[in-house]
Amino acid sequence: MKQDWKPGTMIYPLPAVLVSCGKEESEYNMFTVAWTGTICTNPPMCYISVRPERHSYDIIKKNMEFVINLTTKDMAFATDWCGVRSGRDYHKFDEMKLTPGQCTVVSAPLIEESPLCIECRVKEIISLGSHDMFIADVVNVRADDRNLNPETRKLELAEANPLVYVHGGYYNLGEKIGKFGWSVEKKKS
């Protein structure tokens, strides 16, 4: 039996990412975002949704760029902490002992400890209500060599223990149960 609930955003799990921003080291910040995802494959575009009162909101709006840094089980404490502490009060890179790194295309820092860093340039900002959506072009992706299969050179991100968010909690992924298209594969005879 199913129950009716009030309308809400119940699409879980979501990636729990750290978004980094700032052009100058003095304004570098990172904050936790779960409202993020892919918008388009070609051209590659993604989004983050941010409350206007967040410290990083003005930094991103001013510089029109940010980096989406995927997080891992090892980064879980920092991921939570950066979501409940403000960059107005703390230098989060120092507090969490995470390393700001240089991006290839954007001026915002990436997080060296992240297995995958997605460099983004803001294309449009849409005011939606509690959050504004920053729609962005993906201008570069930096992948950690440790997550590349040495034989195929394919990215094996599941091996990095990515962190996901489910309605108030952080989790790792479970076992792989199939691959894209496996439901229609022809059986080998």
Describe each region flagged by the PLM:
Residues M1-S189:
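Basic, polyanion-binding surface patches
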